């Protein structure tokens, strides 16, 4: 019955919306009516008002609906909704002051005779507005107020115009900074933790190993990564829109005519372009940049946009005169003064102590006063000229009320959807779905698409994502990243906001569109853009580097980049080294052979052994590197026959685990019942049936499975062994040679200790034992910190021991001191000789292996390595063969 009322909920809502009933009342009305019908049916048919609810009853769910409704405007976590009226104010102010229209028209003129130029400029401006708001409602409303009148005046097809505006407005879902991306990042971070635990449990079940290698962990995400990941898909979507409008205008020129540029492309025109185009774009860039740089929150950026729009309106709404730009000039000059003060002075008034500190504060106060004067002057202007400020405030209030009442209705609808088990149905269905990751992923995308018909994007992010994301992220066969999943969900949510008849973007636009534009024209206009969004969704889905590359690049090139030894980088770093060795045309091998010829005559034994050990390890590393490819090819050859068996067996085992879990719950439930309870017998019979079902599934596992699994595991173990062997040899090759160079680099410090060493003799001869012991100890510590000075350090250690309280043997101490002097003299000789005899060859050798087999031993990645790894790690690597 819950399913019946869930279907009834959707049906009532569809009928109400289809009949033209206001959306603000259709959404909560459908929820309340369905809940009351379910309660009445339960009372009449089952004598229980809660009978036809998934959990709870009508009282609980109506209360939950009220709480959801209150949460739209009261929850601290949803303070970003405050930005909606601010950005609406900005858009309406731009429209009233004609700045936005001039911006769109000027950009269209720049395209000249290109058909569809105004539509293309609308997409571009829409993308910029989306980048400032990140909120669908505010962006769609702002674009509807700014763009639609201009397009209709230029004889654009109402369908193309409304479709372009609705699609451009929803770019706020995917173009950063976006509120939905921040929410998704938070939810996906938690989901990644759950998925990591699920993957570890799966690894333990199928392999029997207690711990899972860290390279198999689920990749989490952050808001910053989500912004970077969504940037390229957002730009891709904008380019697809522009290409479509251009193609459409070429096929149907009457529906998207070119905007004539009667002024011509002369110096005066370009000056007008600069005056018209630069200030609004600078405002948009300022709003977006303040968010990305972390200077302002979304709400603060909205305030910046509202004030900036007012300042520009202050000089646009009055006729040409000598003082037209005065308020704007004061604002810009004040900002420059504040920037200079902040950059050159400590502006903390509590910490100010010097005249210079107070000078900076006075400059800042002067700049602030100027800023307030300029802003206030602009507000007075727009208040006095045609009563623009009053009109803007009134329109902002009306539009804000429209947007928020839709959000309130969506909150009530969400409560009803939960009441009838919509969430649980989705979760259980997804968990039991066969067909592997991509079947599950397709279903999830479809579910999110459908839920987007009647759920706010925030509700989808906080309700649906926690349910489905852990299941998708935990699957080792796809091994997707959380940032890719988040961007895909963001693109999907954006698509669903355009879907007739329930797309919220359409309702937002309908609220501001003139009556001449029919609703059916809006529906017809968005169909093409829905198709374009689905194409973009498929492109991003098929090519994950579009999402993953920028976050990886940013991470690997940052100051906090992971070191080359990071386990997650090893597979791709091995590939980088393989390619580098293949491309160097034997230069590395030649460097190894040259290192073997370095003369170590009259050098201490450790130098010769280090060079010999390093070159041998380097040759072993090269051989192991070739062995990796052989082992990997063997795994790949065997994979074709092993993977179908693996997929079959893991699928059967998954079914067995699910049935066994359900069976154990029923068995536990039966054990708590009385023996004479008739339900116990039914449950026990069901438990027995499930046991038979498990046995039947186990019988389907091929008899040769264990042998096939063991054989394939030997191949994967051989590949792992080859990789580990290469890495050990490469590390040894670098470290052994690097010790020699570190020893020679310590020579200046070694020479600097000669005076201290000579000064120790009189101390040993005449000073108190305790004083002499401390002096020897300090000098020993100094030599201990130098590479290659062990023989001197050991002799000084014996000196210290002889002068200790227990020994107090001055004669022995002086003998050991003479040995230290002799060792020091010997070192001076061979260190001087090594500077010309050993250092050049070792330095050339280390330079030759630094970027390949010695890469793991470096402190940081080179730019070339980081870029390669960013590209390599952007692809999703199938890990299912290890599970």
Language model features with spans:
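Alpha-helical transmembrane segments of multi-pass membrane transport proteins
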Residues: 1-883
């Amino acid at each position: 019955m819950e399913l019946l009322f869930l279907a009834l909920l959707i049906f009532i809502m569809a009928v109400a919306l289809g009949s033209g009933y206001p959306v603000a009342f259709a959404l909560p009305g459908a929820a309340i009516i369905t809940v009351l019908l379910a309660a009445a049916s339960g009372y009449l048919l089952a004598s229980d008002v809660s009978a036809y609810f998934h959990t709870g009853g009508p009282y609980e769910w109506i209360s939950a609906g009220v709480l959801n409704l209150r949460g739209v405007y009261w929850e601290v976590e949803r303070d970003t909704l405050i930005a909606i009226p601010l950005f609406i104010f900005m858009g309406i102010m731009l429209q009233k002051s004609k700045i936005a229209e001039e911006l769109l028209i000027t950009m269209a003129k720049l395209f000249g005779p290109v058909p569809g130029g105004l539509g293309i400029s609308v997409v571009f401006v829409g993308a910029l507005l989306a980048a400032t708001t990140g909120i669908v409602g505010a962006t769609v409303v702002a674009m509807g107020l700014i763009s639609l009148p201009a397009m209709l005046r230029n004889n654009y097809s109402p369908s193309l115009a409304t479709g372009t505006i609705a699609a451009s407005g929803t770019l706020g879902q995917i173009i950063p900074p976006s509120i939905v991306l921040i929410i998704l990042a938070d939810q996906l971070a938690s989901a990644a933790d759950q998925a990591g635990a699920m993957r570890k449990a799966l690894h333990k079940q199928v392999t029997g190993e207690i711990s899972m290698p860290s390279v198999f962990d689920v990749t989490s995400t952050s808001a910053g990564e989500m912004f970077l990941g969504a940037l390229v898909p957002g730009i891709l979507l904008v380019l697809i829109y522009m290409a479509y409008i251009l193609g459409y205008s070429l096929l149907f020129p009457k529906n998207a005519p070119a905007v004539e540029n009667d002024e011509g492309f002369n110096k005066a025109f370009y000056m007008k372009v600069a005056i018209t185009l630069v200030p609004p774009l600078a405002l948009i860039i300022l709003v977006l940049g303040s968010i990305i740089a972390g200077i302002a929150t979304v709400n603060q950026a909205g305030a910046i946009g509202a004030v900036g729009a007012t300042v520009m309106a202050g000089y646009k709404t009055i006729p040409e005169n000598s003082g037209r730009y005065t308020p704007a000039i004061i604002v810009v000059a004040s900002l420059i003064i504040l920037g200079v003060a902040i950059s050159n002075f400590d502006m903390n008034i509590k910490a100010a102590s010097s005249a210079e500190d107070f000078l900076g504060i006075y400059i800042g106060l002067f700049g602030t006063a100027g800023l307030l004067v300029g802003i206030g002057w602009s507000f007075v202007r727009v208040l006095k000229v045609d009563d623009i400020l009053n009109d803007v405030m009134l329109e902002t209030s009306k539009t804000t009320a429209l947007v928020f009442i839709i959000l309130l209705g969506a909150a009530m609808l969400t409560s009803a959807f939960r009441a009838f088990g919509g969430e649980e149905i989705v979760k259980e269905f997804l968990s039991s779905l066969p067909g592997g990751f991509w079947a599950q992923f397709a279903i999830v995308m479809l579910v999110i698409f459908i839920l987007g018909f009647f759920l706010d994007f925030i509700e989808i992010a906080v309700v649906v994502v926690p349910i489905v994301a852990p299941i998708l992220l935990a699957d080792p066969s796809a091994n997707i990243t959380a940032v890719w999943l988040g961007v895909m969900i963001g693109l999907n949510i954006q698509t669903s906001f355009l879907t007739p008849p329930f797309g919220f973007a359409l309702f937002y636009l309908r609220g501001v569109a003139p009556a001449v534009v029919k609703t059916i024209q809006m529906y017809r206009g968005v169909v093409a853009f829905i198709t374009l969004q689905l194409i973009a969704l498929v492109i991003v889905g098929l090519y994950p580097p579009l999402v993953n590359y920028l976050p990886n690049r940013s991470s690997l090139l940052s100051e906090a980049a992971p070191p080359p030894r990071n386990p997650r980088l090893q597979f791709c770093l091995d590939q980088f080294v393989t390619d580098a060795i293949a491309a160097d045309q034997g230069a590395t091998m030649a460097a190894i052979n040259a290192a073997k010829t370095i003369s170590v005559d009259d050098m201490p034994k450790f130098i010769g052994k280090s060079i010999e050990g390093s070159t041998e390890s380097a040759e072993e590393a090269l051989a192991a590197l070739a062995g990796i490819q052989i082992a990997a090819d063997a795994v790949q050859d065997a994979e074709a026959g092993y993977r179908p068996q693996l997929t079959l067996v893991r699928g059967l085992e998954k079914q067995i685990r699910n049935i066994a879990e359900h069976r154990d719950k029923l068995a536990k439930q039966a054990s708590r019942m009385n023996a004479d309870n008739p339900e116990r017998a039914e449950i026990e019979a069901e438990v027995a049936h499930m046991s038979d079902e498990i046995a039947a599934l186990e019988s389907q596992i091929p008899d040769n499975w264990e042998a096939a699994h063991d054989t394939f595991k030997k191949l994967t173990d051989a590949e792992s062994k080859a990789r580990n062997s290469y890495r050990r040899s490469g590390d040894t090759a670098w470290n052994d040679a690097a010790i020699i160079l570190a020893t020679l680099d310590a020579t200046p410090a070694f020479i600097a200790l000669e005076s201290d060493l000579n000064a120790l003799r009189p101390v040993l001869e005449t000073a108190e034992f305790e004083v002499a012991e401390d002096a020897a100890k300090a000098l020993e510590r100094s030599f201990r910190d130098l590479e290659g000075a062990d023989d001197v350090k050991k002799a000084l250690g014996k000196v210290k021991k002889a002068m200790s309280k227990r020994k107090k043997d001055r004669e022995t101490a002086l003998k050991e001191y003479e040995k230290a002097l002799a060792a020091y003299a010997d070192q001076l000789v061979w260190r001087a000789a090594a500077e010309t005899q050993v250092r050049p060859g070792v330095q050339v050798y280390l330079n030759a292996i630094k970027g390949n087999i010695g890469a793991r031993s470096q402190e940081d990645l080179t730019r070339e390595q980081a870029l390669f790894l960013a590209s390599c790690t952007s692809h999703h690597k199938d890990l299912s063969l290890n599970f």
